[in-house]
């Protein structure tokens, strides 16, 4: 997350339902008022305006609501504990770029470019609350709108997780059969990205919901828990460079690629470092993901096993005839490991 994105996330959190600031904003909307509220970087904000009057009074939702009945901006300290100015006329340079059309929103966007303040604009006509940080605006939604979207995303998350679980089971069988194609891997990677995209969308709503989002967060975790590590291991299994550092870079490349492009096996192969590979090209997995799902393989042990054997198939070829080799690596109960892998395969050791 960039610095600007972090600042926007913090600003949205300040306006979440249940906060005094959000209560004031809801009253402003209910009163069919417009408003311009500047939070933080108060020296720079005050330097960019004039007139109005000095207050230095403690912040309450009712006070902010009453002060917004006047035309000018209200200036609040960064911790939202003090109201410093009211009816303050802001004069940011008109040369500061903005695509906003309304006077109040243009001023808000320019003030957020000129200063490090969070600027909140409430449209009197449209009855919309917009938060501005670094020239970018984020339109807040009410709780009913947010919860409607939450329900849609949770259904999508549940369905995608179900598809992903089935695809991973199939992939494990193919890995143990030693016949995995680029197309097989591309399907699973695509589902991982869809799952994480939906989870990211849900995270933004959880942030906007504030305390109201706690139960949503718990439901999100039910569907996403453990998937982050499994995704990284899957990439390491199939990427040309299997290091953790390279996997992080590859994940970022997948994240920046449109999900629909990830349905193209050739494009997925390119991102994994295999130029010219097609849908039916065969890939050999290292086995990190599969081994990590076996209870007797302690954390970090999968890497040692892969370093020793080179691939999952080499391990499968050797495990039945030479279990002592695993014992030498420090694997507890090599027989249980062998039995677990064969059960995944649907066969007996």
Predicted regions and their residues:
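Long, highly charged, low-complexity intrinsically disordered interaction regions
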Residues: 228-349
